[in-house]
Amino acid sequence: MLQKTVGIVLHTLNYNDTSNIVDIYTRENGRASFLVSVPRSRKSAVKTVLFQPLSMIEFEADYRPMSNLYRIKEAKSWYPFRTLPYDPYKSSIAMFLAEFLYRALREEAENGPLFAYLEHSIRWLDECDRSFSNFHLVFLMRFSRFLGLYPNTEDYREGCFFDMLNACFVSVRPLHGAFLKPEEASRINLLMRMNYETMHLFTMSRLERNRCLVIMNDYYRLHLPDFPVLKSLDVLKELFS
């Protein structure tokens, strides 16, 4: 059955000489995998350039029962980027977040609030014309709400530890090893106070920002089965050095 929808590109894999497999987070059906023919002429209904990290596209696909790979028939840009592909900092963030979402998003069901969050975040980054060096950290922290992993801040006091396993601040050092000492726990509390509009008001050094990035990666690895150390992590750390 042919169905039109919109979605956000997460990952593209060269399948063979004639096709690519593209993972897309769609508005109506959540995450799904699609077969995309490699264009052989300029008149092709599907252009390869559409499937860059975090591209937002509108497309028509053939959804067939009992299949987990659907063929895209037509595609076009749903939101043409203004700056994201052309700014090396923004495009590197997009590459990192696309890899993160490819590993973290596993549900194959509609989730309107999550899709709206992703759409808003990508548009905000593309349109931003001021400091966005903390964007990826704020994105990762806010995203954890949709997985039920957002830390409980009610018990935070100066000098608390952060129990990464139980996602809460505690006054006594946990018996297990997955925790942050008070100094680093305070940075996590600071990060949780940021949003896209206010994050430029919070000063973080290169070392602090990179450490927070590693902590967030470790946090997701603790809570999501088979979540890896992201390959683009080092690229992002170098970029904002």
Curated annotation (Swiss-Prot):
Pfam families: RecO_C, RecO_N. One of its GO terms (biological process) is DNA recombination. GO terms for cellular component: bacterial nucleoid. InterPro entries: ARFGAP/RecO, DNA_rep/recomb_RecO_N, NA-bd_OB-fold, RecO. Keywords: DNA damage, DNA recombination, DNA repair. Gene3D superfamilies: Nucleic acid-binding proteins. HAMAP family: RecO. PANTHER family: DNA REPAIR PROTEIN RECO. Involved in DNA repair and RecF pathway recombination. Belongs to the RecO family. This is DNA repair protein RecO. It comes from Phocaeicola vulgatus (strain ATCC 8482 / DSM 1447 / JCM 5826 / CCUG 4940 / NBRC 14291 / NCTC 11154).
